[in-house]
């Protein structure tokens, strides 16, 4: 049997009741987990929040909406590689923006808030990026070229508090949330790099980088609204995927508000094994997760289940049977991902024979199944390997 393949695509504060789990001797939430409270950058605003800012500056609701649309198109609507648009009173006047709005708009910095700290090209042409924020926080993104389109793996937090045992980011703890503009700026930087490198344009975004997107859902949704705005970045909502470890109580708000697809990281066929590698399962069982998906999944939409395969842990034919039974009744597909080297040496990738047997068994149940092959593994850019903060957080020379 020929196994279908796709390239690897590496899509709000924690609630007070979440346990302060520990990893490697330190609390998972190491500093303030809040979003930075600055809103002085233009990319921190989608059209709606920009209109609200302008309304508070004295404009009528209709005038504020009209101006915000013009500004979004001017600031973010240019093709990749085009010069940065002018941002001064003359440029605003040329757009037809009245003087009443100039002060509020010109207080917003249109430049990206991130800078490239490291570029790590892989042998397969994947590019791992480490980006530095204004406060020194380090964020990783991964640019994954393909024949028809390039994919960017986007981060939503600095670190992560969810502590999945196969994920390097989970060992770092949660340092802080990313602001919407910092999420957007990952895309701005990557889109320019993709144009510079040639090849297929950046058209696909997956929130599968550092962090749990549902733990920063407000900023993630705001960023997605700007990224999918036809006046701005123009990403198709069907080409934006947000991956969650399974924070079940955020699934309904996500489907209500997001212009994006949903991926759920499952990784085990039963609660006992899932909880052994994913602490979130202690709060949201697999049954609760399935119920939340079934209740919220809009008509005509599908959910993507991600299933990282570990040798002799979750890769037996009987495990495929259990997984097929679990996803039965849901409009879905399953991405099977051979695990990459990570923090737990006991979790190893399966042999090719066990991988093929698992996929054949799952497909035999009528489950749409794809295999996601590793990309960027040699530079630490594959699924579960993003830990650039630890690599680069070195004392600065005196």
From Swiss-Prot:
The keyword 4Fe-4S applies. GO terms for molecular function: 4 iron, 4 sulfur cluster binding; metal ion binding; RNA methyltransferase activity. It comes from the Bacteria. Residues 146-378 form the Radical SAM core domain. One of its GO terms (cellular component) is cytoplasm. It is found in: Cytoplasm. [4Fe-4S] cluster binds at residues 160, 164, 167. Keywords: 4Fe-4S, Cytoplasm, Disulfide bond, Iron, Iron-sulfur, Metal-binding, Methyltransferase, S-adenosyl-L-methionine, Transferase. Its main location: cytoplasm. Its cofactor is [4Fe-4S] cluster. The keyword Mitochondrion does not apply. Belongs to the radical SAM superfamily. RlmN family. This is Probable RNA methyltransferase sce1580. It comes from Sorangium cellulosum (strain So ce56).
